Regions:
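Sec-exported extracytoplasmic/periplasmic mature domains
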Residues: 34, 83, 87, 96-101, ...
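N-terminal "mature-domain start" segment
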Residues: 1-63, 114-118, 161-166
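A short, solvent-exposed beta-edge/loop patch
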Residues: 36, 109-166
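Well-ordered mid-protein domain cores that form the structural environment of catalytic cofactors
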Residues: 105-106
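Extracellular secreted precursors and ectodomains with disulfide-bonded cysteine-rich loops/domains
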Residues: 101-102, 126
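A short acidic-to-branched-hydrophobic micro-motif
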Residues: 61-95
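Short, surface-exposed beta-edge/turn micro-motifs
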Residues: 59-60, 72-76, 133-135, 142-144
């Protein structure tokens, strides 16, 4: 008896089901940020899977979180293993806008965007009215996207991006 061949995902539901949670992606992030451990965030992964854009661009996702418990500064990062060719410039802008809107929705909205270089990588930074910042890095050679949000004077978002592992 033979089994039916596996079909490629064709519908949005099929594609969403094909996005895996892969904690191994967290190895791209530094183990610590300013001395605070980066730990997997199942809540963040669940939120990422609910993003309507993710299934069209990502094959796998992981989320990590680091916090200074004494003062509440934090960084939250989503690492996405991209589908080959799925994130051209326009789609990357859409991703950033969607991520920034979501991150800033509880911080009084997006008030600015900037582009800079950190550790030799182009980084897109969003600023929320409430002080939260977002960071986006596209590692084209690895088909990986990292989007992070951070709050606080310690600038944990910048430190996370600065210390990404090769």
């Amino acid at each position: 008896m033979t089994s039916a061949p596996t079909r490629a995902p064709t519908s949005t539901a099929d594609i969403a089901a094909a996005v895996a949670i892969d904690p191994a992606l967290l190895a791209i992030l530094p183990a610590t940020v300013d001395g605070f451990p980066v730990v997997e965030s199942p809540e963040g992964e669940a939120a990422a899977l609910a993003d309507p854009i993710l299934p069209s661009v990502g094959r796998a996702v992981a989320a990590g979180f680091a916090i200074d418990p004494a003062i509440g500064d934090f960084v939250y990062a989503v690492v996405v293993q991209l589908r080959p060719g799925a994130l051209p410039d326009e789609a990357f802008r859409d991703w950033r806008d969607s991520f920034d809107e979501g991150a800033c929705s509880q911080a009084d909205g997006v008030v600015g965007h900037a582009e800079t270089e950190i550790a030799g990588r182009t980084v897109y930074i969003g600023t929320c009215a409430g002080g939260l910042r977002t960071y986006h890095v596209l590692l084209k050679d690895r088909d990986v996207l990292i989007s992070a949000s951070a709050a606080g004077e310690r600038r944990l978002g910048e430190l996370l991006i600065e210390n990404l592992r090769p």
